[in-house]
Regions:
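Positively charged n-region of N-terminal signal peptides that target proteins for export
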Residues: 1-4
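Bacterial N-terminal signal peptides
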Residues: 8-19
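Beta-propeller-forming repeat regions
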Residues: 22-384
Length: 384
């Protein structure tokens, strides 16, 4: 059976493919940096129209930055600001019309083990945003927003309690959202500070499977048949978002991951005899978030990641004060083998625990947006 390649973990991966139709040589690609904020407000960001004016804005926890001049607007009564020596209460942000009223709302995954909230966009820009609880407990540090069950709506992929399940929350409708278990109780990857979770078609049957560093759950013919069958695999060290794609072009899907608090960017090759881990890059520490997107429009998805600056403060982890870089790694194939060419985007910003790659300004090119302890930044892709 011919294997089907699936790029998963963010709906943006599916939506932005049309935005990268203009192929370009990497030497002709640059990124123009705009600092949206110099305060630490969030380690996640969302791209969406948060004031219904037709432009893409940037959400970051308690605020959003309104395009085109990026004026900061508060979602709460007062915007939050955090000490860079500590942590925020905003680890992942996603944009979605949660209640189906035609307006884009802001989903904020809080500190690990705490609530996921969603803030309802008001009918008028000067109205008050309403706060709702989506999930009372959200475990694992890299929850993701994608369609797990194939119903056309994005779900929140997460670990949750009680029971320590890997599963997904059906976003929308009544709150808290309905939780659907993928795993049995006490599954790996379900502690509040667990690292590494993702989704994609691991076995090539056309269905979206779920994976953590300890293995993957095989999607049944109906997602309601729980628990899913678990396959134990060593997908390496504690990581962040995990992606599934046929990187070497041999017909079966592989996995990409990045080190959350140590050093390493890897691809895990699926072979007839099992899985083999390869190092892509080892010059960046704390690559605590990852995106898989086609930056240069050559129909091969590239990796985008960077350093989570001061992930555990100024003395924690490895090389906490090294430059806060952002990179994209260009996927190329030679003789049936993949290789990744590193291209630096910036060296004084970094990433958080989640970031977005999207066509922010509508020019057909993919841009990068981040938020972390160095503030919030928008990197506009420009072509020479």
């Amino acid at each position: 059976m011919k294997r089907r390649t699936t790029v998963a973990l963010s709906i943006l991966v599916l939506l932005v493919s049309s935005a990268t139709s203009l192929a370009a040589d990497a030497a002709d690609i640059e990124f123009k940096r705009t600092r949206l904020d110099d305060k630490f407000r969030s380690e996640g960001v969302a791209v969406g129209d948060f004031n219904s004016d037709g432009r893409m804005d940037v959400g970051a926890g308690s605020v959003y930055y309104a395009a085109p001049d990026w004026k900061m607007m508060s979602v709460l009564e007062q915007p939050k600001e955090f000490d860079p020596h500590a942590y925020s209460d905003s680890f992942c942000n996603f944009a979605d019309d949660v209640n189906g009223d035609g307006r884009t709302d802001l989903i904020v995954v809080g500190f690990p083990g705490k609530e996921t909230l969603w803030f309802e966009q008001p009918a008028s820009p000067d109205g008050a945003w309403k706060r709702h609880v989506g999930t009372p407990i959200t475990n694992n540090e890299s929850p993701s927003f994608l369609d797990v069950d194939g119903d056309g709506r994005r779900d929140l992929l997460l670990g949750y309690d009680p029971g320590k399940h890997i599963g997904f929350a059906r976003v929308g409708g009544a709150t808290p959202w309905k939780l659907v278990p993928v795993s049995a109780e006490n599954a790996p990857g379900t502690d509040r500070f667990s690292h590494g979770i993702g989704a994609g078609d691991v076995n090539g049957d056309g269905r979206t499977d779920v994976l953590v560093t300890a293995g993957w759950w095989e999607a049944p013919d109906s997602p309601s048949k729980t628990p899913w069958v678990f396959h134990a695999v060593n997908f390496g060290e504690p990581c962040a978002q995990m992606y599934v794609y046929d990187f070497d072009g041999d017909g079966d899907n592989d996995v990409a991951s990045t080190s959350a608090h140590m050093i390493g960017i890897w691809w895990h090759e699926q072979t007839p005899d099992g899985w083999k881990t390869h190092t892509i890059f080892k010059d960046i520490s704390q690559t605590h978030s990852l995106n898989l997107v086609d930056i240069n429009g050559d129909d091969l998805p590239d990796l985008v990641t960077g350093k989570r600056y001061w992930a555990h403060g100024p003395t924690g982890d490895v090389n906490p004060d090294h430059p806060a870089v952002v990179y994209w790694f260009e996927l190329q194939r030679e003789g049936g083998k993949p290789r990744w060419i590193p291209h630096r985007i910036d060296d004084d910003s970094g990433v958080g625990t989640q970031f977005e790659v999207a066509d922010v300004n509508g020019d057909g090119l993919l841009d990068v947006v981040t938020a972390n302890k160095k503030g919030a930044h928008y990197f506009e892709q420009v072509r020479k």
